């Protein structure tokens, strides 16, 4: 608890059972802190404000955005992937799965 945004725990992309708490003054500072990272796999907010929830979904710089939900995992039928330096390449699930798991080839045959 009471970590700062410049601490190593908050500047690296950690995959593990880790929770970090950064105190902020208001929603605007929270969004700024959330976006102040080179990574952007997943981001989330817990709020009762529909205004903040909608604004966060549109402005969080992440490939997946959750409101009042855990930030780990997605349904199998939706695209899974990040933004910025997270999750390079095409999305791994949903309609993007074909692009992720195949190589497109154009071929012609003359009869």
Region spans (language model):
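Conserved C-terminal structural/oligomerization subdomain of aldehyde/semialdehyde dehydrogenase
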Residues: 1-111
């Amino acid at each position: 608890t009471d970590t700062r945004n410049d601490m190593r725990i908050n500047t690296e992309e950690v995959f593990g059972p880790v929770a970090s708490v950064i105190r902020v003054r208001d929603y605007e500072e929270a969004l700024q802190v959330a976006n102040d990272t080179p990574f952007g796999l997943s981001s989330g907010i817990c709020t009762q404000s529909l205004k903040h929830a909608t604004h966060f979904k549109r402005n969080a710089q992440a490939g997946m955005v959750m409101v009042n939900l855990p930030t780990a995992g997605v349904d199998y039928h939706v695209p899974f992937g990040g933004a910025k330096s997270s999750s390079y390449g095409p999305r791994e699930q949903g309609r993007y799965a074909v692009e992720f798991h195949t190589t497109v080839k154009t071929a012609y045959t003359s009869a």
